[in-house]
């Protein structure tokens, strides 16, 4: 009689982590950063129909990389959760911190109890009444909440090069156009440094949205078309070392 194969719990966790990390690394990058007027989302995304950046609630936005079907189920679940909380209590009681904790618990349960972990990394952002109240939460595949950089979040492909570029170029209280140029330049960093990044930063391949502090009511707004073109860095800047633009998300499976 053949003996069943045995794998230690430590080995299972390592293999699940490796699977999730590889899936996330294949995804196109997303940058989320604070600027003077709120929070800016810039995602590499050539698909006009599948979104990596979305609204969750009045002041809360969502961005993700990895397997689309998995982070889309998280997005929908998050919307249902905050809608219920706002209905039962008060819309002002809904906040990004509580939602991030719910996502952390969900991802942790999936990672430890299911055969396959979610190949996703997500960011939950909330715009406050002033810049000091803006919040960014990055959640990894195992439910860990990472807040190593309070001013910006990078997810997906070549995060090291993009993070390094943002540390060089990011500054507080940037205007929207400046913040967009900084994000685009950072997304181009892997290709300019010789790393195998996608480097797709033309306006048609970027998904750009903001949480606009001054907007009445719901703060989330997408930036597309002529408005995006007018905010983009000049063409000579995009083709030079400081290049950049945003792009849209959604390669079907791995985003």
From Swiss-Prot:
Its annotated pathway? Answer: Protein degradation; proteasomal Pup-dependent pathway
Query: What InterPro entries has UniProt attached to this entry?
Result: Ntn_hydrolases_N (IPR029055), Proteasome_alpha-type (IPR023332), Proteasome_asu_bac (IPR022296), Proteasome_sua/b (IPR001353)
Protein encoded by which gene: prcA
Query: Tell me, what does this protein do in biology?
Result: Component of the proteasome core, a large protease complex with broad specificity involved in protein degradation.
Q: Name one GO biological process term.
A: proteasomal protein catabolic process
| Principal location | cytoplasm
Q: Tell where it localizes.
A: Cytoplasm
The record's note on quaternary structure and interaction partners says: The 20S proteasome core is composed of 14 alpha and 14 beta subunits that assemble into four stacked heptameric rings, resulting in a barrel-shaped structure. The two inner rings, each composed of seven catalytic beta subunits, are sandwiched by two outer rings, each composed of seven alpha subunits. The catalytic chamber with the active sites is on the inside of the barrel. Has a gated structure, the ends of the cylinder being occluded by the N-termini of the alpha-subunits. Is capped by the proteasome-associated ATPase, ARC.
The residue ranges flagged as biased composition, category Basic and acidic residues, are 202-217
Name it.
Proteasome subunit alpha
Region of interest called Disordered, as start-end residue ranges on this chain: 190-255
Task: Spell out the Gene3D superfamilies in the cross-references.
Answer: Glutamine Phosphoribosylpyrophosphate, subunit 1, domain 1
The record's comment on protein family reads: Belongs to the peptidase T1A family.
Compositionally biased tracts (Polar residues) = 190-201
The UniProt GO MF terms for this protein read: threonine-type endopeptidase activity
Q: Which CDD domains match?
A: proteasome_protease_HslV (cd01906)
The activity regulation comment is:
The formation of the proteasomal ATPase ARC-20S proteasome complex, likely via the docking of the C-termini of ARC into the intersubunit pockets in the alpha-rings, may trigger opening of the gate for substrate entry. Interconversion between the open-gate and close-gate conformations leads to a dynamic regulation of the 20S proteasome proteolysis activity.
Q: Report the GO terms under cellular component.
A: cytoplasm; proteasome core complex, alpha-subunit complex
Keyword Transmembrane attributed: no
Q: Which UniProt keywords apply?
A: Cytoplasm, Proteasome
Q: Which organism's genome codes for this protein?
A: Saccharomonospora viridis (strain ATCC 15386 / DSM 43017 / JCM 3036 / CCUG 5913 / NBRC 12207 / NCIMB 9602 / P101)
């Amino acid at each position: 009689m053949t003996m069943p194969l045995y794998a230690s719990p430590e080995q299972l966790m390592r293999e699940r982590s490796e699977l999730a990390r590889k899936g996330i690394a294949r995804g196109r990058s997303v940058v989320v950063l604070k600027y003077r007027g709120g929070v800016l989302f810039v995602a590499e995304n050539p698909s006009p129909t599948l979104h990596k950046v979305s609204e969750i609630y009045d002041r809360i936005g969502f961005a993700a990389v990895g397997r689309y079907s998995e982070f889309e189920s998280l997005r929908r679940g998050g919307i249902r959760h905050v809608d219920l909380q706002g209905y039962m209590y008060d819309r002002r009681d809904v906040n990004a911190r509580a939602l991030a904790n719910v996502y952390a618990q969900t991802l942790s349960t999936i990672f430890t109890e299911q055969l396959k972990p979610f190949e996703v990394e997500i960011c939950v952002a909330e715009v406050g009444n002033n810049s000091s109240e803006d919040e960014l939460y990055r959640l990894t595949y195992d439910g860990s909440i990472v807040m190593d950089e309070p001013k910006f979040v990078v997810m997906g492909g070549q995060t090291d090069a993009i993070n390094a570029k943002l540390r060089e170029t990011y500054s507080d209280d940037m205007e929207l156009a400046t913040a967009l140029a900084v994000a685009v330049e950072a997304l181009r960093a892997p290709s300019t440094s010789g790393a195998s990044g996608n480097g797709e930063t033309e306006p048609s391949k970027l998904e750009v949205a903001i949480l606009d502090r001054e907007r009445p009511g719901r703060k989330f707004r997408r930036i597309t078309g002529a408005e995006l073109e007018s905010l983009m860095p000049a063409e000579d800047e995009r083709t030079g070392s400081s290049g950049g633009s945003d792009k849209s998300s959604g390669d079907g499976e791995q985003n």
